[in-house]
Every structure is written in C-alpha cells, then in structure tokens.
C-alpha cells in the first residue's frame, strides 16, 4: 500500500474485503440515481478510507464518466493515492495504463524503482472475457504488473451481458 500499516496478504487462506468495483451509477442521501462522476468517485474513495473493515478498493467505487476515458486512469489513480493510504488499483486496459498507475503509486510512496519493484504496492484484477479467454490488453497488463512484481488477481469470473451471454442457453 501507500503506507506499510495498510499492507495485507491477498490469496491463500486470506480473504480480502473491498469496496464495489465500477458501477456506472451512484445514488444516496436523498439524491436521485445519476451517472458516475469525479466528485462522487472522490467521496467514495474517502468513505472507503474511513471504513476499517475494507482492505482496499477493487476498482473505481463509481466510474467517473465525466472524465474522458483516455485520461480517466490518471485522475482516478491520483485521487486514490492522495485521498487514501490503502493499496490502489489499476485496470489492465492497456500497457500504458498499468505503467502510469504503477508510476503514480511509486511517486506517492516516495520510493525509488528498486524499492517499488521489491514491494508490492498496487494491484490489478484480470477477469476472463469469455470462458477462459484473455485478450491482448489483459495480457499486457499481466506482463507489465509482473515485470515489476506487483499483484495480479486472475479470475474466471464472467459477467452476464458483458463478458458472457445474458441468459444461459436452455
């Protein structure tokens, strides 16, 4: 993580509790459902920081769709490392996004490349696209993260309608 007291073990006999990952909408406190935005994203990062029952976020607590997708990861990672000291997350949606996320995290920790490469500080989750299929950008994410000894969670999870059929064939 950003600070050693937030470090935790992921995998094996350990369970990791995280905030929700990337819902497109947000609601609450008498406000109607609305598209995800940076203000709500930042507020949810702060809430996650205050909830000691959560180890980290596991994506964006809401997708900040008011930030262009080409630079969204830069703003989101910056907010994650400045508003929370819990280990940040980077989406593996292309090699450069992983590199950017790792560099932002390294700078936030105030460590050199060698230290960063020897101390896992950021993680990514790779979900199979369709049953056991991993696309090029996912593989690039795995390569970039593993080349710097950072954490990658690889899951067989597929989401109906997004990475798999909406209904089960019958």
Residue positions per predicted region:
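Helix-rich catalytic cores of soluble enzyme domains
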Residues: 25-170
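Glycine-rich, N-terminal phosphate-binding loop and its surrounding beta-alpha-beta segment
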Residues: 1-21
């Amino acid at each position: 993580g950003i600070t050693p007291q937030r470090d935790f073990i992921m995998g094996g006999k350990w369970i990791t509790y995280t905030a929700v990952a990337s819902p497109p909408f947000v609601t609450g406190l008498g406000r109607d459902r609305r598209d995800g935005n940076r203000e709500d994203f930042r507020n949810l990062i702060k809430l996650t920081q205050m909830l000691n029952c959560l180890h980290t976020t596991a994506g964006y607590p809401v997708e900040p769709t008011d930030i262009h997708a080409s630079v969204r990861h830069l703003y989101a990672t910056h907010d994650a490392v400045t508003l929370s000291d819990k280990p940040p997350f980077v989406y593996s949606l292309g090699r450069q996004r992983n590199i950017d996320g790792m560099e932002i995290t390294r700078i936030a920790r105030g460590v050199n490349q060698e230290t960063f490469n020897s101390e896992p500080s950021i993680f990514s989750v790779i979900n199979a696209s369709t049953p056991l299929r991993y696309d090029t950008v996912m593989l690039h994410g795995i390569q970039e993260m593993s080349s710097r000894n950072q954490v990658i969670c690889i899951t067989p999870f597929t989401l109906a309608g997004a990475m798999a059929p909406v209904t089960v064939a019958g």
